[in-house]
Regions:
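Residues immediately flanking
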Residues: 128-129, 153, 187, 195
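Conserved alpha/beta catalytic core and glycan-binding cleft of carbohydrate-active enzymes
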Residues: 1-69, 80-87, 92-93, 97-152, ...
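Aromatic- and glycine-enriched glycan-recognition loops and surfaces
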Residues: 40-45, 72, 173-180
Length: 198
C-alpha cells in the first residue's frame, strides 16, 4: 500500500492527470465514512493527512463540494496556503519542482517531499499516515539552512493538539555531506516547513 503513494511520480512528467476526490469516488458516502479511525477526531485527522499528501503532490486537484463536513476551517486555510505558495503548484510539470525526501519508510509510514517554485522558494512537507507520534524524526533535507513550521494539520485551531510552533530548526550535517532536521510529526498529520538557506 505504501508504494501506491509514491508510484504516481514515476509517470508524473509523462502524462497529464488530476488528483481527484469526487462524487464518483465516494459512491454517495461522505469522505469521513470511508476512512479508518476509532472516533470522529481520528477520522478527521486521517482525512487531513490524506489531503495534505494530495495538496503537496504535483498535479491539479479536484475535491467534491460538500465533502468537507467538519473540516471547513481547515480546508479554507489549506486552500489559502496553497494559493499563496507557488512552490506547491508552479512547477507541477517540471522535475525541478519536486524532490522526494522520504519515500522508503513503509515501517513508520512517513512520506516527505520538497516542493520548489521558479524563484527558488522551497517547502518541505512530511506526512505521517499512522496514529503514532514521531518525536525527533530525522528528515534529510536538500537545503542547508533554517526551517520554520508554517502549517500543521494538528494545530488546535483545526481540532488537533498542537500549538503553533514558531521555533526555528537549524539543519545539521550527518557527516556524509547530508543535511537533516529533527522534527516532531503528530500522529495522522502533515506538517509543512519553509526553508531559508544559510
Amino acid at each position: 500500500e505504501y508504494d501506491k503513494l509514491t508510484y504516481g511520480m514515476l509517470y508524473n512528467y509523462g502524462e497529464d492527470f488530476m488528483l481527484s476526490l469526487n462524487h464518483d469516488d465516494f459512491r454517495d458516502k461522505a469522505f469521513v465514512d470511508m476512512v479508518s479511525g476509532s472516533d470522529e477526531k481520528a477520522h478527521l485527522s486521517d482525512i487531513k493527512a490524506a489531503l495534505g499528501f494530495m495538496y503537496a503532490h504535483p498535479g491539479s486537484k479536484m475535491f467534491a463540494a460538500g465533502q468537507d463536513a467538519g473540516l471547513e476551517k481547515f480546508m479554507s486555510e489549506l486552500n489559502k496556503f496553497y494559493a499563496k505558495n507557488a512552490a506547491l503548484y508552479e512547477l507541477d510539470n517540471d522535475p525541478d519542482g519536486f524532490m522526494w525526501l522520504e519515500n522508503s519508510n513503509p515501517e513508520e509510514t512517513v512520506i516527505a517531499m520538497q516542493r520548489a517554485d521558479s524563484k527558488g522558494n522551497k517547502l518541505v512537507i512530511a506526512v505521517n499516515f499512522t496514529p503514532v507520534r514521531r518525536e525527533n524524526y530525522r528528515l534529510h533535507v536538500d537545503v542547508r539552512g533554517k526551517y520554520k513550521e508554517v502549517f500543521n494539520s494538528d494545530w488546535k485551531k483545526f481540532g488537533g493538539d498542537e500549538k503553533v510552533n514558531g521555533q526555528i530548526i537549524k539543519s545539521d550535517n550527518d557527516g556524509d555531506d547530508m543535511e537533516y532536521i529533527d522534527i516532531t510529526l503528530p500522529g495522522l498529520s502533515f506538517v509543512i516547513y519553509n526553508s531559508e538557506p544559510y
